[in-house]
């Protein structure tokens, strides 16, 4: 009786096949359609900003990678399937009516061409999609050059490790994938068509199956041998000793390196054993070779290095690792730009030897001491300079400097931007939101060392006066028309900015048909039509359809507000625009506005980075730059591991037309050279930077924070001392907040010790490792002539100079501060501003901290915002006293006179509202424009009796105030309060 052939899979009806095809088409459109629309709109956008060459280069590179890797991987799999099918046995015995393989064999045979092509094509498509994302690796390999620095182990140029080795790894990994997939495809094919039988005790292989599988297995192991060879070079970025140091350690160089060579030799032997199986039927030889490779990988590759580490290195770690730590120190300094030619170390005693008024640089420092904190005053700017509810300022303002009337001063600056989140009521209608409220209005600046008037002497006067506010200089539409701009701006309209872009759909539609009335809000009495070059034309129906689909907004398609000359403005965040046109750069977390040649431009710092610079310390960018400001704003660099960073590019984004320009500022960066080879016209050379723009360049905060973390460890030269951590520094915690976040660095305008002229520096205090005393002071210059020059003041290891946290504690615990704080907190919220650390008095350290008060809200419609009420200063006296003197007064001048004696504070900038525009406070009463307080009388040394009596009276008055409050006697309470104020004033009147 004949055996019934196995049944195939049930066939689909014609209707089912049609529905299946339609479903596949719809799915493809849903998957591919958005990508095509995004590609088309990106093509339009890159053309608008003049960087279409970047778009096409990246696109072509991705397509070529997709095709090459897809064809190679898919082709190898297809060839393996073809060979396995063609070498199948002629007669395939069926094991029985329930043979499961026969069922699948019949299915494959009925759709042979489908399976033979669909599988390789699917594999190739998937491989190509994954591989195309590695376009950066390929372009750096093609365009990368030499660093001119050789590694200490193999003597190869660093460029090999950063440009070549990643590409070789990329190729090797895809060959691994292709061979492995081909092996499994061959295995399954031979099994289905009878070349491989699993029935019986040992199974069976046909000669063809044995040869094909042996060749593929041998090739895979041969590739593994090549991988062992490249693994040797990867040891120079080993993480075995992290976080102590990155790079090859003693164990890596004396155990793992040799193990890689041994395993390489064993892998070659093992591959030879598999190739021998082509001629020998006995598979025990390749099986034993495989077992040898696995066993060797465990014993030689893992156990041996572990033994060396545990029994040779750990008992003598400082000596064994010394040479490798030395390599790490040298490489890290090179990779992070903190080599000795860029960093000047100076010994600094920590206490002064001269009166500040006798040091020319100190006079300049005191005159420009910053009292306004850009991290606190955003709400003050908003309340006094917002003008309309739909304008706004960023939560953290910026600092820049301007030369006005021959005087260089630092200013708190912010663009008055459109805030879409603040639109209310009918303002949120699509027409209004996207075609009427389209732009901001002007730049607002305030001298950082000045307020409109000093706060009152008593706590009650300080809390209720209209003093302590910024002195504004406004460059907007109104001031332009009036012709009274201190900082002249020709085009004050802001179409691109940080606040504008702080919404999901940040687009604006500008322009219209010829002759149409202006639509965009400009002022209460005027409307405006955009005339800039920015924006993508959407006057034609095809572009309107594309953007309607992009934003899923039908109004773009049907709105009558869109005419033949209309354009759509989007990607309005300056940082996003820079990273779009230069995807190979990492943008700094903060962009800042500056007026250059009469235009408001955003300046964005951009970095080139590498992940595996040999022996350089590897760190996470987001972890290094996070501080108390970033925790509040969420302004962080991406989560990215780096071991090399350079601020090689400064970018500008025009606030009116969105024009992006990239400038080369580091001509010795091989990474930037490579990218300039990829995109020849993207970055403009350094000599094309206008001098007016260069004058506004700041040393970037994020780079400085990365470098200060490195300098905290890598200022140490001795590798053995490095290993013990004894000489390390730490970034101090921010004493003005409750969390333990790092204190941010601060921009300050100080006197240059060599010239006495003002110098714009970025600075940070450093404390000892797990200590609070000050250990070092870092500063880096932003002046064009000395840009990027580091100065590190190193204090003695036994210093008694207080660090920021100790200084804060000593200042707020001072009796004058503590007593008045108690009074102020009854009806005010107190905020301490940036605690500045300033070298002064030829060896001393002066701390300056503004104190802001904000009245507690008394009603639902009452607006409150911070105002400068007091200034605290702290200074350590020279030995043998070493005592810490604290100044506390409404003005910096008075506080300095309390510490240094009369006359020192006379050079400080007095409160005044003469310069700039008075604040527009809305419902707030006008600010008192009165003159600055008269200078204090010359100080005389206080007697112990005077101080004791004043303190005793202060304590007694506070006790009386507490008793009166408990008794509920309002008359007694008023008398007690007056007594406290009188006691505080008497204490403050005592010369300190």
Swiss-Prot record:
Its main location: membrane. The keyword Membrane applies. Keywords: Cell membrane, Membrane, Transmembrane, Transmembrane helix. Residues 904-948 are annotated as: Disordered. The keyword tRNA processing does not apply. One of its GO terms (cellular component) is plasma membrane. InterPro entries: UPF0182. It is a multi-pass membrane protein. It comes from the Bacteria. Residues 908-934 have a biased composition (Low complexity). The chain crosses the membrane at residues 18-38, 63-83, 114-134, 174-194, 211-231, 260-280, 288-308. It is found in: Cell membrane. Belongs to the UPF0182 family. This is UPF0182 protein RHA1_ro06389.
């Amino acid at each position: 009786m004949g055996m019934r052939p196995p049944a195939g899979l049930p066939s689909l009806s014609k209707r089912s096949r049609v529905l299946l095809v339609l479903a596949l088409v719809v799915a493809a459109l849903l998957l591919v359609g958005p990508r095509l629309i995004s590609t088309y709109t990106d093509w339009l956008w890159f053309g608008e900003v003049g960087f279409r060459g970047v778009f096409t280069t990246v696109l072509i590179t991705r397509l070529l990678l997709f095709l090459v890797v897809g064809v190679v991987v898919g082709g190898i799999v297809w060839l393996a399937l073809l060979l396995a099918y063609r070498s199948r046995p002629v007669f395939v015995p069926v094991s029985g009516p329930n043979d499961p393989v026969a069922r699948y064999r019949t299915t494959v045979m009925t759709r042979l061409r489908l399976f033979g092509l669909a599988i390789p094509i699917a594999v190739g498509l998937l491989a190509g999609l994954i591989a195309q994302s590695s376009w950066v690796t390929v372009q750096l390999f093609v365009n990368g050059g030499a660093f001119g620095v050789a590694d200490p182990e193999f003597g190869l140029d660093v460029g090999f490790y950063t440009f070549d080795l990643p590409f070789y790894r990329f190729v090797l990994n895809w060959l691994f994938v292709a061979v492995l997939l081909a092996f499994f495809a061959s295995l399954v094919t031979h099994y289905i068509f009878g070349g491989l039988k699993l029935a019986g005790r040992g199974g069976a292989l046909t000669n063809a199956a044995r040869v094909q599988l042996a060749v593929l297995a041998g090739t895979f192991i041969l590739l593994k041998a090549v991988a062992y060879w490249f693994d040797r070079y990867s040891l120079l970025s080993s993480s075995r000793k992290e976080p102590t140091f990155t790079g090859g350690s003693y164990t890596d160089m004396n155990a793992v390196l040799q193990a890689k060579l041994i395993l390489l030799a064993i892998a070659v032997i093992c591959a030879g054993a598999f190739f021998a199986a082509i001629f020998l039927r006995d598979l025990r030889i390749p099986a034993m070779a495989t077992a040898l490779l696995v066993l060797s990988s465990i014993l030689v590759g893992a156990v041996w290095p572990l033994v060396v580490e545990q029994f040779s290195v750990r008992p003598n770690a400082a000596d064994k690792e010394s040479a490798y730590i030395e390599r790490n120190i040298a490489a890290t300094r090179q990779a992070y730009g903190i080599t000795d030619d860029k960093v000047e170390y100076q010994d600094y005693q920590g206490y002064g030897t001269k009166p500040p008024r006798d040091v020319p640089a100190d006079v300049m420092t005191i005159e420009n001491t910053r009292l306004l904190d850009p991290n606190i005053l955003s709400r003050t700017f908003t309340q006094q300079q917002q003008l309309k509810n739909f304008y706004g300022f960023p939560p953290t303002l910026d600092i820049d400097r301007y030369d006005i009337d021959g005087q260089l001063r630092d200013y708190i600056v912010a663009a008055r931007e459109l805030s879409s989140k603040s639109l209310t009521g009918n303002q949120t209608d699509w027409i209004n939101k996207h075609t009427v409220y389209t732009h901001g209005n002007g730049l607002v600046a305030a001298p950082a060392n000045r307020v409109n008037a000093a706060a009152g002497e008593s706590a009650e006067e300080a809390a209720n006066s209209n003093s302590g506010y910024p002195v504004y200089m406004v460059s907007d539409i109104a001031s332009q028309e009036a012709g009274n701009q201190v900082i002249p701006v020709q085009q004050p309209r802001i179409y691109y900015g940080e606040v504008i872009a702080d919404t999901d759909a940040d687009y604006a539609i500008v322009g219209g048909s010829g002759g149409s009335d202006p639509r965009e809000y400009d002022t209460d009495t005027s409307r405006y039509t955009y005339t800039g070059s920015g924006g993508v034309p959407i006057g034609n129906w095809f572009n309107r359809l594309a953007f309607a689909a992009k934003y899923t907004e039908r109004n773009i398609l049907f709105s009558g507000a869109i005419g033949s000359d209309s354009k759509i403005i989007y990607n309005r965040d300056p940082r996003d625009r820079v990273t779009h046109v230069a995807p190979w750069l990492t943008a700094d977390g903060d962009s800042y506005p500056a007026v250059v040649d009469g235009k408001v431009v955003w300046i964005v710092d951009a970095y080139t980075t590498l992940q595996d610079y040999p022996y350089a310390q590897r760190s996470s960018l987001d972890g290094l730059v996070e501080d108390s400001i970033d925790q509040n704003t969420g302004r962080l660099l991406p989560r990215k591991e780096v071991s090399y960073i350079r601020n090689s590019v400064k970018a500008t984004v025009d606030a009116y037309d969105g024009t992006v320009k990239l400038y080369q500022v580091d001509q010795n960066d091989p990474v930037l050279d490579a990218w300039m080879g990829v995109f020849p016209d993207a970055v403009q050379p350094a000599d094309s930077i206008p001098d007016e723009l260069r004058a506004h360049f700041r040393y970037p905060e994020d780079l400085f924070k990365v470098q200060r973390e490195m300098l905290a460890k890598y200022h140490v030269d001795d590798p053995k001392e490095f290993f013990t951590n004894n000489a390390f520094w730490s970034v101090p915690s921010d004493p003005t907040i409750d969390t333990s976040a790092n204190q941010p660095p601060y921009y300050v305008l100080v006197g240059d010790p060599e010239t006495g002229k003002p110098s714009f520096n970025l600075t940070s205090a450093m404390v000892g490792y797990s200590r609070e005393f000050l250990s070092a002071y870092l500063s880096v210059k932003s002046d064009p002539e000395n840009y990027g020059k580091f100065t590190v003041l190193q204090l003695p290891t036994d210093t008694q100079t207080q660090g920021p946290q100790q200084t804060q504690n000593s200042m707020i615990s001072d009796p004058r501060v503590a007593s008045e704080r108690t009074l102020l907190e009854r009806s005010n919220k107190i905020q301490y501003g940036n605690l500045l650390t300033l070298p002064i008095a030829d060896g001393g350290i002066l701390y300056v901290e503004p104190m802001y008060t904000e009245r507690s809200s008394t009603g639902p419609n009452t607006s409150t915002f911070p105002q400068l009420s007091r200034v605290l200063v702290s200074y350590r006296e020279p030995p043998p006293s070493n005592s810490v003197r604290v100044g506390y007064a409404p003005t910096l001048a008075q506080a300095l006179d309390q510490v240094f004696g009369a006359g020192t504070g006379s050079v400080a900038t007095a409160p005044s509202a003469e310069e700039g525009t008075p604040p527009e406070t809305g419902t707030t009463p006008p600010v008192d424009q009165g003159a600055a307080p008269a200078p204090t009388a010359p100080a005389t040394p206080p007697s112990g009796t005077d101080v004791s009596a004043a303190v005793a009276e202060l304590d007694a008055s506070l006790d009386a105030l507490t008793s009166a409050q408990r008794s509920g006697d309002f008359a007694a309470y008023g008398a007690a309060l007056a007594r406290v104020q009188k006691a505080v004033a008497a204490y403050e009147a005592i010369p300190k």
